[in-house]
Amino acid sequence: MIRKVFFALVGCLLLGQSAQAALDIVITGGIDSARPIAVAPFKWEGNGQLPQDIAEVVSNDLMRSGKFKPLARGQMPQTPSTSGEINFAPWASQGVEAVVVGSIAAVGDGTYKINFELVDVLKGQLAKAQGGESNGYILDSRMATIPGAQMRQFAHRISDIVYERLTGERGAFLTRLAYVSVQQGTQFPYQLRIADYDGYNEKTLLRSREPLMSPAWSPDGSKLAYVSFENQKSEIYVQDIYTQQRSLITSFRGINGAPEWSPDGRRLAIVLSKDGSPNLYVVDVASKQLTRVTTSRVIDTEPSWMPDGQNLLFTSERGGKPQIYSVNLATGMTRRMTWEGESNQGASITPDGKIMVMVTRVQGQYRIARQDMENNALLVLTQSALDESPSVAPNGSMIIYATIYQGRKSLALVSTDGRFKAVLPTSSGEIRAPAWSPFLN
């Protein structure tokens, strides 16, 4: 897998278009181990049809996190819209730990007022039994007035709040995915796309007749770096996802590949073969100043930044087979990081620096694995035959990767503890090279 040959000829097109739910999510494992929760339908205080089923979005978000098992609406003992309407006993009898309730009201000019509360069922049951006036069982309560066009995004915001209050970790539902869609037999078979993490609000940033590869998000979520072959060779570009403006970063002879943003957003770690074997370089995005990092005679590739911004992880064949190494940018000192498995490659670190995620080869099959950075314990997370391109959510809880599902290259999810698994099948073509965005405001 490490020795990829690149070919290209001509043609690309910049554009922006939207679509709905281009990616569906099919749960394949792990939901039975999740915590039971309920998201009651939000009360609609208006005329006509509810503009957005916020409760459904929140429920699906929490389910996809792998940490929660939302109660089906048909199993709910009641449909309260405020904490005061909750009868805690029947919820507790079903094992529900917390309930989300809320309401939506139209306020004119296409705007809506949304109220919601997150309620602890056990604390509420105890408070009612003691006959007290305390509302300490209300874990969170908020109100916002928003445009109708932002209602789905606000639902993700509610999910983030609920997730953080119940787990102590920041939610990653207000995030995006970047990926390459391949539709062979069309005028522009390669398309660089972004979408909300759940597949909604998809936009195409670039259409090309030739391969597009390795999208990588800037730390502020406003730009993508990627590899394009539109000019008969590999080149690295940076493109603003809002203005569509892009700039050419490198166009050297040979390989220009694998861009990865530094934590400060000023530099890219890249792979160049302009002087022979593929080696690691760092390029300043503004000045284009280039600094060589490794001088190996074998393949060094797939750089990834450590959270400190002073070290890189990378894949190298210097030991005979692909393994993960680290290199200090100041000293140039390298250290081998992986010793288990037939080979290991494509590593990245969770934001807290505690877990290294990578592709490991087990009995000839490529699977997603994690390695504890403290004790080096390796855990294989997937059981497929050809998994690749893992990208970690900004809160470190989930990994998105490319796999083969029902004969097509698709995207899949696995939690970093391995308990939750899902696939994001595509109805046509293939999906490759996923990249999870940073947290977005």
Curated annotation (Swiss-Prot):
Q: Which GO terms describe its cellular component?
A: periplasmic space
State its location(s): Periplasm
Which BP terms does GO give this entry?
cell division; protein import
Family matches, as InterPro entries:
6-blade_b-propeller_TolB-like, PD40, Tol-Pal_TolB, TolB_N
Q: What is its main location?
A: periplasm
- What superkingdom heads the lineage? Bacteria
The secretion signal range is 1-21
Query: Cross-referenced Pfam families, in alphabetical order?
Result: PD40 (PF07676), TolB_N (PF04052)
Which keywords are on file for this protein?
A: Cell cycle, Cell division, Periplasm, Signal
Which PANTHER family does this entry report, sorted A to Z?
PROTEIN TOLB (PTHR36842:SF1), PROTEIN TOLB HOMOLOG (PTHR36842)
Its function, per the record, reads: Part of the Tol-Pal system, which plays a role in outer membrane invagination during cell division and is important for maintaining outer membrane integrity.
The entry sums up its family as follows:
Belongs to the TolB family.
Question: What is known about its subunit structure?
Answer: The Tol-Pal system is composed of five core proteins: the inner membrane proteins TolA, TolQ and TolR, the periplasmic protein TolB and the outer membrane protein Pal. They form a network linking the inner and outer membranes and the peptidoglycan layer.
Identify this protein by name: Tol-Pal system protein TolB
